[in-house]
Amino acid sequence: ADDLTTLRNGTLDRGITPDCTFNEKDIELHVYSRDKRNGIILKKEILKNYDLFQKSQISHQIAILIHGFLSTGNNENFDAMAKALIEIDNFLVISVDWKKGACNAFASTNDVLGYSQAVGNTRHVGKYVADFTKLLVEQYKVPMSNIRLIGHSLGAHTSGFAGKEVQRLKLGKYKEIIGLDPAGPSFLTNKCPNRLCETDAEYVQAIHTSAILGVYYNVGSVDFYVNYGKSQPGCSEPSCSHTKAVKYLTECIKRECCLIGTPWKSYFSTPKPISQCKRDTCVCVGLNAQSYPAKGSFYVPVEKDAPYCHNEGIKL
């Protein structure tokens, strides 16, 4: 999983400066469907030259997953999410593997320079995702309303850059972007052009789980602050809380129960009790969040163990 905790020390274990430079040819696409549950690896160029997607696949909703710093496209948490998306909603899942640009080869170092390179690479990956989207729309006739992006950490901001680029290409907007604890370091003071922003898709959902490694301001149509968005139950390290955002969404996709967000005006205010929640005031985290009318900031209480719900018997 992603590990921004390496930034805390700011030193190198091996006394070297990592080279996290990469180009488009280094990016792989891990494609999952009910026919290929374990995934196959493709390159964008192959998709351009051959009709590899069947019409039956393309007609489904498509989720494009984008990992973050030090991670890979087939990390165990994304793999679990892909399987849930396939099993529950028959999605076509495409995980963008930009591990070289995310410094995955230097996972044992405590390096600020490597992270800075990875931050710079997010724009290039965002453009790649937008160009890939253009291919889906123009060659495979996929409507933009069928495509959502799900990005964790740096991948959340990468999703935002892709969202900006598809609009520049006049393709329209993605149906949704879900930002899973969008990365904080190097983004804390950034304005919309330089981070994930609510205008990057028709609907932007952000799930905040770590005040140390994630941003602590609103970036979406709805911003869920799980356990006040600071640290998560059962986690002693910031990286654990940072990764919990992925696990929470996966459980929400399974729909065993609903993580309920209750209106929360600011950090200094008291969240509205879940017992007072109604469908027009509160929101369930997950793929159906758009179906609820409320927008803004929401506090989400959780339990320590999966499926994490702490709903006091309330159903929306």
UniProtKB/Swiss-Prot annotation:
Record: active site: 153 (nucleophile), 181 (charge relay system), 242 (charge relay system)
EC number(s) given by UniProt? 3.1.1.32
Location of this chain's protein in the cell: Secreted
Gene Ontology MF terms: phospholipase A1 activity
* Organ and tissue specificity: Expressed by the venom gland.
Q: Which Gene3D superfamilies match?
A: alpha/beta hydrolase
Query: Residues of the signal sequence?
Result: 1-4
Q: Which reaction does it catalyse?
A: a 1,2-diacyl-sn-glycero-3-phosphocholine + H2O = a 2-acyl-sn-glycero-3-phosphocholine + a fatty acid + H(+)
Asked whether the keyword Signal is assigned, the reply is yes
Top-rank taxon: Eukaryota
Main location (coarse class): secreted
Q: Propeptide positions in this record?
A: 5-14
What PROSITE patterns does UniProt report for this protein, alphabetically?
LIPASE_SER (PS00120)
A single Pfam family it belongs to is: Lipase
Q: What is one cellular component GO term in this UniProt entry?
A: extracellular space
CDD domains, alphabetically?
Answer: Pancreat_lipase_like
Q: Keyword Secreted on this protein?
A: yes
Q: Which major enzyme category is it?
A: hydrolase
> Disulfide pairs?
20-103, 192-197, 235-240, 257-284, 258-309, 277-282
Regarding protein family, the annotation reads: Belongs to the AB hydrolase superfamily. Lipase family.
Q: What is the protein name given in its UniProt record?
A: Phospholipase A1 2
Read off the lineage from the record.
Eukaryota, Metazoa, Ecdysozoa, Arthropoda, Hexapoda
